[in-house]
Amino acid sequence: MAVGSRLAVLFSAALAFVGVSSVLTARPAVAQATVSVACGSVGAEFDLCKTGAEAWSKKTGNQVKVVSVPKDSNEQLALFQQLLSQKSGEIDVIRIDVVWPGLLAQHLVDLSKEVPKDVIAQHFPAIIEANTVGGKLVALPAFTDAGLLYYRKDLLEKYGRKPPTTWQDLTESAKIVQDGERKAGNDKLWGIVFQGRAYEGLSCNGLEWVDSFGGGTIVDGQGKVTINNPKAIAAIKLAASWIKNIAPEGVLNYAEEEARGAFQSGNAVFMRNWPYAWALSQAPDSPTKGKVGVMALPKGGAEGKNTGTLGGWNWAVNKYSKNTKAAVDLAKYLTSPEEQKRAAIEVSFNPTIPALYKDKDILAKNPFIGELLSTFTNAVARPSRVTGSKYNQVSSEFWNAVHETLSGKSQAEESLAKLEKTLTRLSRNGKW
């Protein structure tokens, strides 16, 4: 089936589902408004959203229609783009990825005019900034993610190594532990695994390397292409030096789960991944249970900084909604401290409200979450906001340039110089 036809089917199915999946209020007898919300696909996230929408419905007397959308995030985006381009108000509240605001901003309500400033100020500033396009706040944060470093506590202790503070420390420790274990007969062990496949995950890893060295964010906040600089080159060169040295060549085709599989099976000393991998590494049947530490990603040298690429999801309101006031109220409710606390306790989602990282109930359920506060505070956003509708092209060019360097097809200097020229043409000299 052609892509256009498939999206048309998905679009029709989504709208049909709106009509049959109403969550009715108990009182009052006549609802004040009817609001439709796209709750993601099946599973814990969908159930969490549906339960929250039902609670809001009972609290306000409004009626809610819950919509299930495709599981694949790219198909979700395509569906929303098709719906919004038609100026359809069929779905009032939509859940969007942190890199979508620039792509969808023209179709979304400016929430800075609808939501009190003190409510907005509760959230991590970096996430609010990522959701702000052209001075308009187009989404409220629901939960967040950022890259982390996982390490084998037992192996570092065995070889007298401390958790690394810089990427250079990590490179040295990975080599020492890897060589020592291989001499002892563990020839499957590697020093580090990460997301090295040519896809969005490599853009996240590459941005972390570059930003930790002080090499910028590919494109700065004013739209200028900044990727071709000595610090960025040094960062990518260091990562390239890992391949076949302390990282398997196969890492060039690893996404999140391949990296987690290698690490959790006991075949890596270090791993870069998202917070979700923690609970899995500590499962009762996990070979690494009780052996794993987690920390902020290392600095790019003494003058560098800890960082982690910002991830997560947010709630936005369709500009073409016929029930804007009620839709905004639902978005506020779904991103409230109460709902974020429930999400943290029930499904271990990471709140976007710093105060919740000290909440006793959340910490009792998930002690690990308290260690994430500094990571989310220092998270770096991908340049999706400033590059707008061209972000996907920017990211693709970046991950391909990094992948070519990691695979040895070109040197970092050559790759980033070529990337700079490509992005400058794409940006029309900074005018995205």
What are these regions (language model features)?
Residues 97-146, 162, 187-188, 202-205, ...:
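Hinge/lid segment of periplasmic solute-binding proteins
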Residues 138-142, 147, 171-224, 268:
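Extracytoplasmic/periplasmic solute-binding protein
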Residues 112-123, 129, 182, 190-199, ...:
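Short, solvent-exposed loop/beta-turn-alpha elements that line the ligand-binding surface or hinge
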Residues 32-43, 62-68, 92-93, 138, ...:
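Short, well-ordered beta-strand elements
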